[in-house]
């Protein structure tokens, strides 16, 4: 019964950080997908000039 009371009182302290970590993971996976597309895109496929930064970070 005591464990059930602790879970009932503190569930938000577990779910909020888990949601943050899950969102961070999904954001990283989406960035990987967009980076893979950038490398195949004709717009960004050209050779960069010397000392030129990438156009899409």
Swiss-Prot record:
According to the record, the segments passing through the membrane are: 10-26
The protein's matches in Pfam families, at most eight in alphabetical order, are given as: NADH_oxidored
For whether the record's keyword set contains Membrane, the answer is yes
Q: Does the keyword RNA-binding apply?
A: no
Where does this polypeptide localize? Mitochondrion inner membrane
Which superkingdom heads the taxonomic lineage of this protein's source?
A: Eukaryota
Keywords in alphabetical order: Electron transport, Membrane, Mitochondrion, Mitochondrion inner membrane, Respiratory chain, Transmembrane, Transmembrane helix, Transport
**What GO CC annotations are associated with the protein?**
mitochondrial inner membrane; mitochondrion; respiratory chain complex I
Subunit comment: Complex I is composed of 45 different subunits.
The entry sums up its family as follows: Belongs to the complex I NDUFB1 subunit family.
Q: What does this protein do?
A: Accessory subunit of the mitochondrial membrane respiratory chain NADH dehydrogenase (Complex I) that is believed not to be involved in catalysis. Complex I functions in the transfer of electrons from NADH to the respiratory chain. The immediate electron acceptor for the enzyme is believed to be ubiquinone.
- The name of this protein is NADH dehydrogenase [ubiquinone] 1 beta subcomplex subunit 1
Organism, by scientific name, is Bos taurus
